Amino acid sequence: MNLSFLIFLSVLQGVTELFPVSSLGHTLLVPALFGMHIDKHAPQLLPFLVALHLGTAFALLWYFRKRWCALVRGFFASFGGRRNDDAHMMWALIIGTIPAGLVGLLLEKRLERIFHDLRIVAIALIVNGVLLWFGDRLQRTRAHQAPEKLTFRQAFFVGLAQIGALIPGFSRSGLTMIAGNAAGLTAEKAAEFSFLLGTPIIFAAGVLELPKLFHAPGQLADALLGGVLTAIAAYLSVRFLMRYFEGRGRLASFGVYCVIAGIVFLGWFLLHPQPV
C-alpha cells in the first residue's frame, strides 16, 4: 500500500471511529470521492481495517485505563458478594456487549455485501445524521442519571444500538450515545458509556480477524504502522470528545455534518457510479 494513502486511511479511521460520523462509511466513501482506489474485493481489506480498529481499542484502553482497572476490580469483587457502582457498571457493559457480538458473528458475511454499494453507504450516513439530530433533542428532554445507575435492561437496549453500526454509514458511537440519551444519561456520561461499551467489541473484532491478516502477504508491516497511527489519532480524538461533551457539546453538530456529507457523497456517486 502506498505510504501516503496508508497514513491518510489510518488517521481517517482513528478520528472517525470515535466521532459519531461512521468510521467505516468514511473509510469507504472519502477515498472513492478523491479517486483513491480501494479494492473492495481484496481479501486483505477487512483484516487491514480491523488492524486499524485494534489501534483504536488500545487507545481507548489507555485513555480509560484507571476506569477499567476500577471496573475490573469491582467485577471480581462482585463474586465475593461485594457489589458497588463499579461492579454494576461492569456487568452493565458485559450485558450491553452481547447483542452486537452475537449479530456480528452471525451476519458478518451478509453485511460485507453492503460495502460494495457506496450509494447505500451514503444514504445510511444521511440517516445517521438525522438520528443524531433527534438524539440531541431527546437528550435535552430527559432526566439525567449516572451511568452506574443504568438498569441492566437499559444497558442491553444501548447494546442493541450497536447492531445498526454493523452497516457502513451508521456510527457505533453515535447510535449508542443516542440510546444512552434515551436512557437518561447526560451527553458526557453517554459518551463515556459508549466508548467503554465499544472497546470490547472493537478489540474482539480485531482479534477474530488477526488470522486473516497474518495470511495476507505483505500486509503485516502496513497493519502495524497503520495500527500505531490510528491509535495516536484515536487517543487525541477521545480526549477531544470527552472535553467537548463535558463542555455541553451537542450531537446535533455532528448530525448536520453527516447529512451534508451524505448528500454530497450520494450526489457524487449517482453522477459517477463506482464499480462493484
UniProtKB/Swiss-Prot annotation:
EC number(s) of the enzyme?
3.6.1.27
Show the coiled coil region(s).
Answer: none
Q: Which UniProt keywords apply?
A: Antibiotic resistance, Cell inner membrane, Cell membrane, Cell shape, Cell wall biogenesis/degradation, Hydrolase, Membrane, Peptidoglycan synthesis, Transmembrane, Transmembrane helix
User: What is catalysed by this protein?
Assistant: di-trans,octa-cis-undecaprenyl diphosphate + H2O = di-trans,octa-cis-undecaprenyl phosphate + phosphate + H(+)
Q: Does the keyword Cell membrane apply?
A: yes
Per the record, the GO terms for biological process are: cell wall organization; peptidoglycan biosynthetic process; regulation of cell shape; response to antibiotic
Record's subcellular location: Cell inner membrane
Which Pfam families does this UniProt record tie to the protein? Answer: BacA
- Which cellular component appears as one GO term in the record? plasma membrane
The record describes the protein's role as: Catalyzes the dephosphorylation of undecaprenyl diphosphate (UPP). Confers resistance to bacitracin.
Under PANTHER family, the record lists:
UNDECAPRENYL-DIPHOSPHATASE (PTHR30622:SF4)
HAMAP family on file: Undec_diphosphatase
Q: What else is known?
A: Bacitracin is thought to be involved in the inhibition of peptidoglycan synthesis by sequestering undecaprenyl diphosphate, thereby reducing the pool of lipid carrier available.
The protein in question is named Undecaprenyl-diphosphatase 2
Query: From which source organism is this entry?
Result: Paraburkholderia xenovorans (strain LB400)
Q: What are the top taxonomic ranks of the organism?
A: Bacteria, Pseudomonadati, Pseudomonadota, Betaproteobacteria, Burkholderiales
Gene name of this polypeptide: uppP2
